[in-house]
Amino acid sequence: MKKKLMFAAVLLSAAMLFGCSADKKDGQETTAAVKTESTKAEEKTEEKTEEAKDSAGDAVKANKPYKLALITMDSIDQHWVTLNEGAQAEAKADGVEVKFMSPDTKDDSKQIECVNNAVAGGVDGIMIAANGPDAISSSLKEAKEKGIKIVYVDSPANVEAEASFATNNKAGGKTAGGEMKKALEAQGITKGDIGIISTNASTQSTVDRESGFREAFEGSDFKVLETQYCDGDAAKAQTIAENYITKGVVGIFGGNEGSTVGIGNAIKASGDNKIVGVGFDKSDTIKSLIKDGYLLCTMAQNPDVMGKKGVDALVECLNGKELNGEVVDTGVSVLNKENIQ
C-alpha cells in the first residue's frame, strides 16, 4: 500500500535536556493480523499483515555500512524493546549499524535531544516513533536539510518521510471497543459509563486508537467519558482507573502498554470482576493480567516487523531507491484468554 505523506512543518524552539540513552537490550514479541468487524475486511487485512511479516525477513544489502538511529518514545516499554530487537536483527542481516537512542521517559524535549544527538553523531538515517508530532517536527526538518533520511515506525510526525510502518490504530481501537461492547452485553449490561486512559493528547497513534474505540460505541446507550492521561506510567494509570471504578464505570480502555497495565492492576485491586478492561500492546505483565481474568483482552501489535521493515526502508533509500512516502500497515490481533501463549 503506497501513498504520499504530505505534512506541514511546525517550527519549535526546544530546551536541550538530559535523558537520551543508547544501545539497550531487547525483549521478544510477535503478533499476527488485524481483526475487524467485517469478515471480508479482516481477511484482507490479515493478508496484508502476513505479507508484511513475510517480507520483513528479506534482508536488503547495504551499499555501505550506514549508521542509523532508532528513536522511540521511551526505552522502557516492552513494545519499544521488541521494536529495537527487530531492528537490530535486520541491521545485522543488512550490514548496517543501528543505535537505539531513546529517552528514558516519554518526554518531547528529551526526544528532541535524541534527534539532535543522532544528527551530531553523523547518522545517515533516523527511524523514529514521534512522541509529540508537532514538538519533534522542527528537529526532523533540520535533520532532513542535512541529508539524513527519515522513516517513521509506529507514530509519525508532521514532516514528510521516506516511509512509515505502523498499525492501523483507528481500526485497532474500534476492534477494542467492539470486544468490550460484546463482553458487556454478554453480562446483560447495555448502558453505563466507560473510561479511557491514554498516554497523552498529542501522540497520533494513541489519539487514533481512542477515536476508533469511541466509534465502536456510537448509537449505543453507553457513555464514553473524557479521556484521562497518564504519560504512559502504569502507576498513574492505576490511580486514574481506581477513580473511574469508584465512580461506577462498567469498562475501561487503555490506549497503550502503561495504561493497560494500570487498568488491569486497578481491576485486580477492586475485586470486581464484572468491570471489563481492554487494552493495547502486549507485554508479559499484560498477558498475566489477561490469564488471571483482570483484563478481557489486548490489541497486540507487531513492533518487531516495524523495526525490521524500518531498517530495510532506510537502507533501500540510502542505496538510492525512491520509496515515495509509502505507508505499510503492520497489523494487530486480539489477544485474549483463549489464544494467549
Name these PLM-found stretches.
Residues H79-D94, G172-E179, Q204-F222, G262, ...:
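Short, solvent-exposed amphipathic alpha-helices that sit
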Residues P133-A171, Q187, S283-L296:
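Flexible loop/hinge segments that line or gate small-molecule binding clefts
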Residues D54-K64, D193, I197-A201, S205, ...:
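Hinge/cleft segment of the Venus flytrap/periplasmic-binding protein
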Residues K61-N63, Q111, F165-K191, A235-Q238, ...:
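Hydrophobic alpha-helical segments within soluble ligand-binding/sensing domains
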Residues N116-E145, F213, C230-L289:
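Hydrophobic alpha-helical
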Residues F7, L17-A41:
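Bacterial lipoprotein signal-peptidase II cleavage site
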Residues A91-P103, D193-S198, R214-A234:
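Short beta-strand elements in bilobed, periplasmic/extracellular small-molecule ligand-binding domains
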Residues Y66-G86, E90-D94, K99-N117, V123, ...:
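Extracytoplasmic "Venus flytrap"
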